[in-house]
């Protein structure tokens, strides 16, 4: 027997049963985004490597350690580690955002070479939302309201907490950076080698260190909110007022900075304690300078991303009320001489007239007992039975596989009407 080949570490398969839950979550996402009037876009998973170096920042962990990068002839390419940079690139390239507001969303796989763990994989799936051309805090609030509505639809709202911060303008961060470095230099003995490197290249990233001793010390560090410019301060205050007015509770987390360099002003995360250490479910904020940084006209922008793997895990963990649809509504069973064609004709008639129902025709032969076992295995709600007698009498036997109702015989012409009523009920 030939040696089997396994999936690559950190790259996962999704079974038919698991896919039902994924489809349920994805449909909730699409429904909420459509409710708010957002438009779907699709971008390639491979982009030019310099796009991410310029957008995310060369000293970030994502660019310096985690990207899947390769050469194609003389061009360096990367499997996208996140979606914002590619969306901005597409918006600039195709003129989607010139003198125009856009509210966009996308869904698809991303890739990062990091240590796989629960809810974090090397290939993962993100939903991203990007808004271009709106500067005021109302749109920041709308994105937070949109995510809150989604959490309610998914049945997880009571298990997530909103954390907010403002990281201000570039000048604000530069002033704060100096104060933070001066503070941390008094505690060099607590810094790991990696954190000492960050102190030089990107000291704000030390604020979300996993080092608990250092976290305690950082409670006494200067607060970024105290270094905000007036415009950023007013923007953040108005955002908080809006959230208060609509009853969205939040915590101001002065250590929240996000892991990518393009953010400014508002940053936010929805976090949960239900998934252990990997607590962030969704994160985002403003990135008003990124479009210009990537060669476009200056365009204010804001967005967020959520990891679907982590979202599905959270739904599984806390929402026990989900009733997922079965993979099959109707299973067509047939046995005997000249039953195959009528069975296939009936199945096609149902698919044409009741396209919302999932109809499966048995293939592969076998007696009625074997076919009914298969119908049970796929979770079908009804079996439609055609034998030699039914062919002669132009009838079909309908058997309720879940509800326990007595089976009945119907004329072929009445089957669609019966199923429409029975499955709707």
From Swiss-Prot:
InterPro entries, per the entry:
aa-tRNA-synth_II, aa-tRNA-synth_II/BPL/LPL, Anticodon-bd, Anticodon-bd_dom_sf, His-tRNA-ligase, HisRS-like_core, HisRS/HisZ, HisRS_anticodon
Q: What is this protein called?
A: Histidine--tRNA ligase
Give the EC number.
Answer: 6.1.1.21
Q: Pfam families under this entry?
A: HGTP_anticodon, tRNA-synt_His
User: Which PANTHER family does this UniProt record tie to the protein?
Assistant: HISTIDINE--TRNA LIGASE, MITOCHONDRIAL-RELATED, HISTIDYL-TRNA SYNTHETASE
Q: How does it assemble?
A: Homodimer.
- Among its keywords, does the record have Repeat? no
What family does the database annotate? Belongs to the class-II aminoacyl-tRNA synthetase family.
Reaction catalysed by this enzyme = tRNA(His) + L-histidine + ATP = L-histidyl-tRNA(His) + AMP + diphosphate + H(+)
According to its UniProt entry, one GO biological process term is:
histidyl-tRNA aminoacylation
One cellular component term from this protein's GO annotations in UniProt: cytoplasm
For this UniProt record, give its keywords in alphabetical order, as a comma-separated list: Aminoacyl-tRNA synthetase, ATP-binding, Cytoplasm, Ligase, Nucleotide-binding, Protein biosynthesis
């Amino acid at each position: 027997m030939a040696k089997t080949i396994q999936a690559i570490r950190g790259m996962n398969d999704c079974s038919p049963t698991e896919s039902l839950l994924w489809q349920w979550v994805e449909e909730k996402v699409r429904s909420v985004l459509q409710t708010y009037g957002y438009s779907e876009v699709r971008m390639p998973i491979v982009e030019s490597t310099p796009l991410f170096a310029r957008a995310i920042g060369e000293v970030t962990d994502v660019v310096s350690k985690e990207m899947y990068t390769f050469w194609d002839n003389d061009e360096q390419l990367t499997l996208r580690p996140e979606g914002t940079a590619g969306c901005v690139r597409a918006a600039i390239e195709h003129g989607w955002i010139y003198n125009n507001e856009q509210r966009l969303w996308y869904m698809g796989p991303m890739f990062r070479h990091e240590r796989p763990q629960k809810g974090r994989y090397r290939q993962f799936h993100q939903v991203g939302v990007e808004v271009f051309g709106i500067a005021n805090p109302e749109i920041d609030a709308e994105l937070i309201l949109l995510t809150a509505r989604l959490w309610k639809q998914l049945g997880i709202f009571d298990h997530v907490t909103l954390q907010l911060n403002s990281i201000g303008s570039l000048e604000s961060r530069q002033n704060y950076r100096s104060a933070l470095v001066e503070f941390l230099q008094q505690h060099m003995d607590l810094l790991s080698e990696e954190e000492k490197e960050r102190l030089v290249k990107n000291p704000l990233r030390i604020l979300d260190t996993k080092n608990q001793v250092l976290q305690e010390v950082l409670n006494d560090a200067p607060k970024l909110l105290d270094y905000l410019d007036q415009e950023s301060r007013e923007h953040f205050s108005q955002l908080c007022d809006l959230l208060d007015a609509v009853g969205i509770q939040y915590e101001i987390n002065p250590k929240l900075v996000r892991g990518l360099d393009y953010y400014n002003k508002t940053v936010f995360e929805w976090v949960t304690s239900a998934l252990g250490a990997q607590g962030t479910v969704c994160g985002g904020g403003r990135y008003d300078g990124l479009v210009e940084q990537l060669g476009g006209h200056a365009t204010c922008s804001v967005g967020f991303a959520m990891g679907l793997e982590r979202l599905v895990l959270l739904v599984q963990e806390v929402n026990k009320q989900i009733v997922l649809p079965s993979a099959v509504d109707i299973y067509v069973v047939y046995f005997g001489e000249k039953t195959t064609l009528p069975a296939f004709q009936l199945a096609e008639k149902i698919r044409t007239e009741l396209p919302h129902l999932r109809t499966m025709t048995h293939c592969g032969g076998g007696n009625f007992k074997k076919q009914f076992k298969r119908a049970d295995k796929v979770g079908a709600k009804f079996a439609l039975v055609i034998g030699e007698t039914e062919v002669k009498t132009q009838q079909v036997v309908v058997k309720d596989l879940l509800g326990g109702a007595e089976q009945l015989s119907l004329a072929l012409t009445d089957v669609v009407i019966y199923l429409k009523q029975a499955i709707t009920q």
